[in-house]
Amino acid sequence: SVRHYKRENVSPGLLQELLDSAAYAPTGSNAQNLLVSVVDDIAAMDALREAVYLRLDELAETGAMPDCQRRAFFLSAGKLWKAGGWDGIFRSAPHCVIVANAKNATCVEQDPLIYLSYFELMAQARGIGTLWCGLLYWCLRDVLPDFLPRLGIPDTHQLGYAMLFGYPSINYRRTVETR
């Protein structure tokens, strides 16, 4: 998992290559009902990041934060962003990919995870770092579901998962040995 990114857009050609490769991921009943939403530009990602933290701060300030998984984190995330720019959800990633599946799909939960697994393998093979972002997933699912249409995800689809990605700002010289 990469949690430190260069502030640099992934080239459109490489991004399209990754998305095209992941499109070959199998789906239950070969339905291919996935909807893939990509934030492919740093400026768009910055706008999303700002909007999410602003809304989280409003919910915390007004006492309207829903009771959900990671509620304590979400109560403080907007305040920490406002106070010093701490980006606990997005990790300053320049991009994200969010996958949803048709609510009536045979494998509504599994298909997006398989898609993102393909995306991750191809991305890492091409030098792009990724992070399975549970915090963004929980935030969109439990706290800010009204953001889903902004991301192009209609009511006919169920949020599957989110992945951050971009060029890593840290180089790891060697990996941990495995048995």
State the predicted function of each range.
Residues 1-179:
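Acidic, surface-exposed loops and disordered segments
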